[in-house]
Amino acid sequence: MKAIISLLLISAMVFSMFEAVPVRRRFTAFEGERGCLPHNRFCNALSGPRCCTGLKCKELSIWDSRCLG
């Protein structure tokens, strides 16, 4: 009985170590989608002059401030 309890405790400790590692992976299929922030509909400032349409970052026309494509 003690062996079973010890085995359960050890497996719980091992599982908790694996559980502590964050598993956040974002999938960006295209280069143009990188930097799009859907919560405020703007692209990341580091991605250049771009804007969000839907969930995709598109090029921003400098002359008339609208999305191209």
Swiss-Prot record:
<comment type="function">
    <text>Insect active toxin causing rapid but reversible paralysis in crickets. No activity shown in mammals. Does not show effect on mammalian voltage-gated calcium channels.</text>
</comment>
<protein>
    <recommendedName>
        <fullName>U2-agatoxin-Ao1o</fullName>
    </recommendedName>
</protein>
<feature type="signal peptide">
    <location>
        <begin position="1"/>
        <end position="20"/>
    </location>
</feature>
<keyword id="KW-0027">Amidation</keyword>
<keyword id="KW-0528">Neurotoxin</keyword>
<feature type="modified residue" description="Leucine amide">
    <location>
        <position position="68"/>
    </location>
</feature>
<feature type="propeptide">
    <location>
        <begin position="21"/>
        <end position="34"/>
    </location>
</feature>
<keyword id="KW-0732">Signal</keyword>
<keyword id="KW-0960">Knottin</keyword>
<keyword id="KW-1015">Disulfide bond</keyword>
<keyword id="KW-0964">Secreted</keyword>
<dbReference type="Pfam" id="PF05980">
    <property type="entry name" value="Toxin_7"/>
</dbReference>
<dbReference type="GO" id="GO:0090729">
    <property type="term" value="F:toxin activity"/>
</dbReference>
<comment type="similarity">
    <text>Belongs to the neurotoxin 01 (U2-agtx) family.</text>
</comment>
<feature type="disulfide bond">
    <location>
        <begin position="51"/>
        <end position="67"/>
    </location>
</feature>
<dbReference type="GO" id="GO:0005576">
    <property type="term" value="C:extracellular region"/>
</dbReference>
<feature type="disulfide bond">
    <location>
        <begin position="43"/>
        <end position="57"/>
    </location>
</feature>
<keyword id="KW-0800">Toxin</keyword>
<feature type="disulfide bond">
    <location>
        <begin position="36"/>
        <end position="52"/>
    </location>
</feature>
